Regions:
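Extended active-site neighborhood of metal-dependent phosphoesterases/phosphodiesterases
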Residues: 57-182, 192-200
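N-terminal active-site segment of His-dependent metallophosphoesterases
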Residues: 1-56, 61
Length: 203
């Protein structure tokens, strides 16, 4: 699990971007995870710190990095991934991560009739194709109103009712397909994975 990588993608952030990318690459190379989930603020196109409004470059740089490492990955968005002044909105950023060139990316933009971008489920299956657990990713939006004043004030949005309804329906769907209740992934106090998750051999 990664968060707040803050790749500025501009001339002012070149040095710190390289440090962030190298840190991620080192961590993943050492840990060798089966799946990496980045939960927001992958890009950080804040002009006075990055020197650009271009949030495409940060998103693209992260995608290229993950593909070069050959690990499965996905993302959810933070407030900085598509600021009101950024060149690309959340829908456009979702299209970047949905690009077929990212072969290891499990990201999905999600249903059009559900608020937000990136609402999706990753089903963890055993070798018999049975869903043993599920990872549900939900877009918690950015700001209540997508404008500069709200972003400065930090008036953050949240998960909307139709997203909760979507989540409930997805859980019901998977339970119905399996004819059993899907367990949530739980970590123990020592940071290890739940014993049931450790037995899963494939996605």
């Amino acid at each position: 699990h990664l968060t707040d990588i803050h790749i500025g993608g501009g001339f002012l952030s070149k040095e710190v971007d390289e440090k962030a990318i190298n840190a991620v690459a080192t961590m993943i190379t050492k840990e060798k995870p089966d799946l990496v989930i980045a939960t927001g603020d992958i890009a950080f196109p804040v002009p006075y710190m990055a020197g650009t409004f271009n949030n495409y470059s940060g998103a693209k740089a992260f995608g290229n990095l993950m593909e070069s490492l050959g690990v499965y990955w996905t993302v959810t968005f933070g407030n900085h991934d598509a600021e009101c002044y950024s060149y690309f909105d959340r829908e456009a950023v979702a299209e970047i991560y949905s690009d077929e060139e990212f072969k290891h990316c499990l990201f999905q933009a999600g249903p059009e009739d559900v608020d937000g971008y990136g609402n999706h489920v990753i089903e963890v299956k055993n070798t018999d194709g049975i869903i043993t657990q599920a990872i549900v990713l939900i877009d918690s939006q950015a700001y209540v109103k997508n404008n500069l004043i709200e972003s400065i004030k930090g008036t953050y949005d949240n998960i909307h009712p139709n997203q909760v309804e979507w989540y409930e329906n997805e859980i019901k769907r998977m339970n119905s397909e399996n004819n059993k209740t899907i367990k949530a992934i739980q970590g123990d106090v020592n940071g290890g994975l739940h014993k049931d998750f450790a037995t899963v051999k494939s996605l």
